[in-house]
């Protein structure tokens, strides 16, 4: 099977590349190994989009990129799948519902007539001399071969590039985004949680809970006034 563009990886970068190519009229195939689009936002339940807004000392979120990123953020908010942005230190992030993001991503891709999305699909091999000429895919055990004119590897770990034996390059350490541990808390009294966190910042060990904080959080579980989400850097 021939196509104009093959995009490997259905996360934010892959979705943007595939939709942009399809909107230009290119016959595009988007391959995603999981059962939904969205990348780590859906597969790993990373419930906030970081990098959508400029890093600023001043308050007030400013979009870093207009066009498709702004459109996708607006679609999330309109669909009730996101709210914000929310300020976290110098960062502005957009909290979202992972299932809601998957739904909006699916709708966005579905609007493109020349875009074919293949979920539960992995790349098995890449063939070519000096460049990739064909790619073998497996969708739940069914193998197919694609011959694309252009390939975008948005897998997150250069999966196709590695299979092809091509060279890779990485930005210097000081230019890489630091990893974050994302988690959600439910049925927590937010005021008590904020108080405990503020107290922890002034202790000798940030990992040591301030006196009484465990009791306050435990008591909050029983009252459960509302849910909260936090991001730990």
Give the label of every model feature segment.
Residues 10, 139, 155-156, 164:
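Glycine-rich, N-terminal phosphate-binding loop of Rossmann-like dinucleotide-binding domains
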């Amino acid at each position: 099977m021939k196509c104009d563009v093959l995009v490997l990886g259905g996360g934010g970068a892959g979705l943007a590349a595939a939709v942009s190519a399809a909107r230009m009229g290119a016959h595009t195939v988007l391959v995603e190994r999981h059962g939904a689009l969205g990348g780590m936002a859906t597969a790993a339940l990373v419930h906030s989009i970081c990098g959508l807004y400029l890093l600023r000392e001043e308050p007030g979120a400013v979009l870093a990129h207009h066009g498709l990123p702004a459109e996708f953020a607006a679609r999330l908010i309109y669909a009730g799948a996101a709210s914000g942005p929310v300020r976290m230190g110098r960062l502005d992030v957009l909290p979202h519902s992972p299932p809601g993001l998957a739904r909006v991503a699916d709708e966005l891709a579905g609007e493109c007539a020349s875009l074919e999305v293949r979920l539960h699909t992995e790349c098995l091999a890449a063939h070519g001399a000096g460049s990739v000429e064909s790619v073998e895919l497996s969708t739940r055990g069914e193998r197919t071969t694609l011959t694309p004119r252009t390939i975008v590897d948005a897998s997150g770990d250069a999966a196709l590039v590695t299979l092809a034996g091509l060279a890779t390059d990485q930005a210097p350490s000081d230019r890489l985004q630091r990893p974050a541990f994302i988690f959600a808390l439910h049925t927590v009294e937010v005021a008590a949680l904020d108080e405990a966190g503020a107290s922890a910042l002034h202790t000798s060990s940030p990992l040591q809970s301030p006196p009484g904080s465990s009791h306050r959080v435990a008591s909050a579980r029983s009252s459960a006034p509302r849910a909260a989400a936090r991001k730990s850097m």
